[in-house]
């Protein structure tokens, strides 16, 4: 029986393990969280932990995230099925209860007889991985906090960016008389809790934010952020109105017939709505400063923090220089790299990466090469970005600029067309794979 060892039980590692095992491949799945768990980053012992937001992004049928999820669903993504089972109300977005999601994934892994789960193990290098866990092929899916030794054994030319996390507060400390339930433009159900700010309240918040005590970055490193992970104070430093035109934009909301100057949204962390994530409020402020600054928001004066915001350094490899078309290493072709370590950014992108890597391995075991998905698909776009050198490689996520589908339709119609046509072409590609797609 063919055997694959997967280092890392995050989104990519779990998806790859389930895809391979469903097709008769013996899998050893090794948890690989850092030996010293950072409580500000990791909170769970289980697999597939969602570290940052609890949202898998929009389910609107004119968005790149919808298209990528649709493609993964066509290919039978196990983790998106788990997400549906753990879903919480979040307007047009697919958001999950983190703990329920992890338990759902753990149940899928436990139910699959072809998967052997290994306890949390620190692996120092690729040679260490091969010696301790021999297999036909290996997948490294250790995520953005990969150990320095393992990272160095992959390549000396690795990149990084900083990722910021937003705080989570308890519902018990919120003054609901000052907040209101609504979704922007009244789309769907009123699933978000909203905190409206008048101009004076907004200015006071920005003043405190800019003056707050913040954690320093690592010595001799220039702070580089992926746009969606930028700390709120960094945005405010770019201009006092940046937040009111960004994460705090008030468009689509009215309070007593008037649009507020700014609106802070809170997204439920679970079905009971006992905890809320402060949307867009990722931060590197010290804990005491977070209490002081966020309690200036109307309705949050007595907020109880269940998790403080934080910043951590994410490492990723220079994929265009290091990876082959199947997402295996050019210098170590029996080793594949999946998930955020490979250079994709986002939950859905990590799930896709694990799924695609599994398909590439299945094709290889069958003596074939996996044909690339069509250029109009998000899968094809992500793959091309991971393979095409274009100056300094930056993490890639699902967006319309990575697909090839020209049309002269109006903007809204064009997006709908791109998504529908990309999903159609992916379906045709998928059904043409024949044996690779067949689960036992």
Language model features with spans:
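Helical element adjacent to the flavin cofactor pocket in flavoenzyme catalytic cores
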Residues: 98-117
């Amino acid at each position: 029986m063919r055997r694959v060892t997967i280092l890392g039980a995050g989104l990519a590692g779990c998806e790859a393990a389930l895809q391979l095992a469903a097709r008769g491949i013996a899998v050893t799945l090794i948890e690989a969280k850092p030996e010293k768990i950072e409580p500000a980053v990791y909170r769970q012992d289980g697999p597939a932990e969602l570290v940052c937001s609890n949202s898998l992004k929009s389910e609107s049928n004119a968005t790149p995230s919808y298209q990528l999820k649709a493609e993964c669903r066509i290919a039978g993504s196990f983790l998106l099925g788990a997400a549906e089972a753990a879903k919480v109300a979040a307007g047009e977005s697919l958001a999950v209860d983190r703990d329920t999601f992890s338990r759902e994934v753990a149940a899928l892994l436990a139910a699959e007889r072809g998967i052997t789960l290994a306890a949390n193990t620190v692996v120092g290098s690729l040679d260490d991985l091969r010696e301790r866990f021999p297999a036909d092929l290996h997948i490294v899916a250790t995520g953005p906090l990969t150990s320095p030794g393992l990272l160095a054994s992959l390549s000396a030319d690795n990149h990084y960016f900083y990722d910021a996390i937003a705080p989570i507060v308890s519902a018990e400390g919120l003054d609901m008389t000052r907040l209101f339930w609504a979704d922007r433009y009244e789309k769907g159900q009123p699933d978000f809790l909203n905190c409206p700010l008048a101009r004076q309240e907004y200015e006071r918040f920005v003043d405190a934010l800019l003056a707050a005590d913040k954690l320093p970055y690592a010595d001799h490193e220039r702070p580089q952020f992926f746009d969606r992970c930028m700390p709120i104070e960094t945005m405010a430093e770019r201009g006092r109105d940046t937040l009111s035109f960004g994460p705090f934009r008030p468009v689509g909301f009215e309070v007593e017939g008037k649009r507020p100057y700014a609106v802070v949204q809170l997204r439920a962390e679970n079905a009971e709505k006992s905890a809320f994530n402060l949307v867009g409020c990722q931060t590197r402020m010290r804990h005491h400063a977070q209490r002081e600054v966020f309690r200036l928001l109307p309705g949050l004066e007595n907020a109880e923090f269940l998790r403080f915001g934080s910043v951590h350094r994410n490492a990723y490899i220079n994929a265009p220089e290091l990876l082959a078309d199947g997402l295996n290493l050019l210098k170590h072709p029996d080793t594949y790299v999946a998930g955020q370590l490979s250079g994709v950014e986002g939950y859905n992108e990590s799930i896709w990466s694990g799924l695609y890597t599994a398909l590439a391995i299945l094709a290889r075991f069958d003596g074939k090469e996996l044909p690339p998905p069509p250029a109009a698909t998000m899968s094809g776009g992500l793959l091309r970005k991971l393979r095409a050198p274009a100056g300094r490689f930056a993490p890639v996520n699902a967006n319309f600029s990575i697909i090839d589908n020209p049309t002269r339709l109006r903007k809204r119609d064009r997006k709908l067309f791109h998504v529908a046509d990309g999903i159609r072409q992916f379906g045709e590609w998928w059904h043409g794979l024949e044996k690779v797609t067949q689960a036992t």
